[in-house]
């Protein structure tokens, strides 16, 4: 059994070296943005009257669809406001980070022949996938801890340690979930574009299902990982069970990904690739058109991420 994971640690360190700039940029961006918003909200709405006026907006179905259901509206604190307006959008951003990083070190590495080269060395067949998961888990744990203690360090009464730990844990759990999900899709598909496409498709469906469920049917919200994580009711009731359920589902997905990786051939997948067009578009005849076509998926991913970031600003 141990030979399946030979030199996983060395591969993990290699992944860290490849991402010595990318991962820190993601972490610093997410953490600093979260703490900045946490520091700004009490200054924007310093009185209880102003906060109660904001609480009334959460009764609007459109707002509920965007950010999730409101909790603690009778005594709307800075912490409750922070969680209501930021947790869903930040969770989506963390999900995007995990999708892109996991796809890069699973299906993309396999598509470009890097995994084949690694397997020619003394490395276990499951070591590349395990190393990628290990690095993403560590990355999400760092986000969890830095967000939690960063928010607590602001010193606001309603942004307490327990709620801050749960806020950070919610982000870490949703990140681990989307990393495991992307690793699972990487085993089903045959190319990196499909892996990212399926993963982002699931993210979009999960967000829409959460929105509809929060407005009309809570069952849809509980099925969606984004809706489930909002049931933590951070800084109000501080429920930990959604985090535990999310991590549990992630473990199952991780196990399935490892199993599928062990039974399939290198470079293959379980979902057949549709045949391409017999003739290329005229648009592809120019260098710009070809570049846009090749980078279509990352561009769409970044547009979605920036749109969500803009919506969170407001």
Pin down the residues of each PLM region.
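Terminal transmembrane helical anchor/hairpin motif
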Residues: 5, 41-74, 201-256, 260, ...
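Pore- or pathway-lining transmembrane helices of multi-pass membrane proteins that form conduits
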Residues: 25-29, 192-209
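Alpha-helical transmembrane segments of multi-pass membrane transporters/translocases
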Residues: 26-30, 231-284, 294-310
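Long, hydrophobic alpha-helical segments
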Residues: 82-107, 147
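Secretory targeting signals
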Residues: 134-189
């Amino acid at each position: 059994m141990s030979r399946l994971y030979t030199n996983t640690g060395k591969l993990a360190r290699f992944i860290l070296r490849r991402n010595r700039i990318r991962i820190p940029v993601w972490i610093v961006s997410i953490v600093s943005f979260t703490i900045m918003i946490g520091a700004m909200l009490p200054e924007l709405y310093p009185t209880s009257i102003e906060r109660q006026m904001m609480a009334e907006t959460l009764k609007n179905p459109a707002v509920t669809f965007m950010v999730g259901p409101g909790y603690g509206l009778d005594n709307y604190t800075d912490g409750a406001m922070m969680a209501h307006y930021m947790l869903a959008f930040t969770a989506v951003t963390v999900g995007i980070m995990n999708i892109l990083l996991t796809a890069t070190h699973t299906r993309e590495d396999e598509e470009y022949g890097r995994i084949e080269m690694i397997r020619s060395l003394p490395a276990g067949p499951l070591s590349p996938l395990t190393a990628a998961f290990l690095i993403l888990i560590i990355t999400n744990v760092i986000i969890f801890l830095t967000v939690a203690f960063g928010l607590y360090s602001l010193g606001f009464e309603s942004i307490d340690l327990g709620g801050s730990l749960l806020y950070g844990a919610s982000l870490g759990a949703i990140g681990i979930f989307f990393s495991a999900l992307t690793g699972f899709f990487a085993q089903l598909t045959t190319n990196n574009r499909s892996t990212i496409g399926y993963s982002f498709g699931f993210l979009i469906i999960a967000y829409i299902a959460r929105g509809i469920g929060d407005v009309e049917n809570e069952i849809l919200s509980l099925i969606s990982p984004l809706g489930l994580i909002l049931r933590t009711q951070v800084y109000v009731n501080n429920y930990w069970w959604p985090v535990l359920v999310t991590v549990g589902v992630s473990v199952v997905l991780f196990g399935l990904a490892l199993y599928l990786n062990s039974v399939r051939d290198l470079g293959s997948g379980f979902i057949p690739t549709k045949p391409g067009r017999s003739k290329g578009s005229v648009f592809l005849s120019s260098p710009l058109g070809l570049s846009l076509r090749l980078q279509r998926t990352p561009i769409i991913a970044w547009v979605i991420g920036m749109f969500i970031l803009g919506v969170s600003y407001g």
